[in-house]
Amino acid sequence: APLTNEYLNHLCHKC
């Protein structure tokens, strides 16, 4: 499944 912007945002927040 392609990564969505929301998922990327979550990772950024985790970072």
Swiss-Prot record:
Please list the tissues where expression of this protein has been recorded: Pollen.
The job of this chain, per UniProt, is described as: Major component of the pollen coat.
Provide the protein name.
20 kDa pollen coat protein
Q: Which organism is it from?
A: Brassica napus
Give the lineage: Eukaryota, Viridiplantae, Streptophyta, Embryophyta, Tracheophyta
